[in-house]
């Protein structure tokens, strides 16, 4: 594990593989390992993959102040620069997609292409706002209940049913034990306040937006809103829940590789 100092934060990040730079940005409550670790064998032969843990995740440490998207974007960029992989392709998941949007808008000279999975621009939508407020409350009062809620809203019904009782228990228990709950609480506050709409309008990089047809955390309508704002963005959809890269990593990797390795993409 590597570290780079950014403001008051000591940002941890992983480097794997060889080739051009590919930076993966995790989502709320996730980290570089739980969101991306299982995908490394499919990526590291073609890219040098950098996986930062932004504030609130992994072993990254800071003073605990309120999170801002520009500061998290700066942390991700600093990790990429420290790893010497600029320019790079960027992949963001959920809150990480909002961070990627901010980076592509504010650091265009560093970015080649971007992929956004389960993306949203803001939580102005009342359903999304209510959901994140519920997450915030359950982090304080009942983390096991929140873990069950994330399972039910984060995966497709068929995927959950196929796990059986024991499989579902394993997933729930892994959420309870592996999530950095205090850090997630800070990230949820950012989910509630974030708005990268203006940044999205400034993006001029090739962009692939991946929605998820069974997503009940960030419905695919949110991803389609991103497509309407980013000039020239492509849209495709996976038949999964929000946690598509965990539910169906093979299909996610196929989409990722097809876009990032395409000779038709500048």
From Swiss-Prot:
Its EC number is 3.5.1.-. GO terms for molecular function: carboxylesterase activity. Changing residue 94 to A: Loss of catalytic activity. It is an enzyme of class 3 (hydrolase). It catalyses: pyrrolizixenacetamide + H2O = 3-amino-5,6,7,7a-tetrahydro-1H-pyrrolizin-1-one + acetate + H(+). The keyword Zinc does not apply. Disruption phenotype: Cells lacking this gene are no more able to produce pyrrolizwilline and accumulate pyrrolizixenacetamide. Acetate binds at residues 28, 95, 242. SUPFAM superfamilies: alpha/beta-Hydrolases. Keywords: Hydrolase, Serine esterase. The active site is at residues 94, 215, 242. InterPro entries: AB_hydrolase_1, AB_hydrolase_fold, Meta-cleavage_hydrolase. The keyword Hydrolase applies. Belongs to the AB hydrolase superfamily. PANTHER family: SI:DKEY-122A22.2 (PTHR43139:SF52). Involved in the biosynthetic pathway of pyrrolizwilline, a pyrrolizidine alkaloid. Catalyzes the N-deacetylation of pyrrolizixenacetamide. Homodimer. This is Pyrrolizixenacetamide deacetylase. It comes from Xenorhabdus hominickii. The lineage of its organism: Bacteria, Pseudomonadati, Pseudomonadota, Gammaproteobacteria, Enterobacterales.
């Amino acid at each position: 594990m590597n570290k780079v100092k950014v403001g008051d934060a000591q940002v941890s990040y992983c480097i794997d593989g060889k080739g051009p730079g590919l930076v993966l940005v995790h989502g709320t409550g996730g980290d570089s390992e739980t969101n991306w670790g299982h995908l490394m064998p499919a990526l590291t032969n073609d890219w040098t993959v950098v996986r930062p843990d932004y504030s609130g995740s992994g072993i990254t440490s800071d003073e605990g102040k309120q999170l801002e998207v520009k500061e998290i974007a700066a942390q991700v960029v600093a990790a990429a620069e420290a790893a010497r992989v600029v320019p790079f392709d960027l992949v963001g998941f959920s809150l990480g997609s909002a961070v990627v949007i901010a980076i592509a808008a504010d650091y265009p000279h560093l970015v080649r292409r971007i992929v956004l999975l389960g993306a949203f621009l803001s939580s102005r939508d009342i359903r999304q706002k209510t959901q994140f407020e519920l997450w915030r409350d359950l982090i304080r009062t009942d983390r096991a209940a929140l873990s069950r809620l994330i399972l039910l809203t984060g995966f497709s019904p068929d995927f959950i049913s196929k796990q059986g009782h024991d499989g579902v228990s394993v997933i729930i228990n892994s959420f309870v034990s592996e999530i950095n709950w205090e850090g997630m609480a800070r990230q949820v506050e950012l989910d509630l306040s974030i708005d990268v709409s203006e940044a999205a309008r400034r993006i001029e990089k090739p962009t692939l937006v991946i929605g998820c047809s069974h997503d009940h955390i960030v419905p695919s309508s949110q991803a389609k809103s991103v497509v309407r704002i980013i000039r020239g963005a492509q849209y495709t959809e996976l038949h999964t829940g929000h946690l598509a890269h965990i539910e169906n990593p093979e299909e996610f990797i196929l989409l990722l590789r097809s876009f990032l390795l395409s000779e038709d993409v500048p």
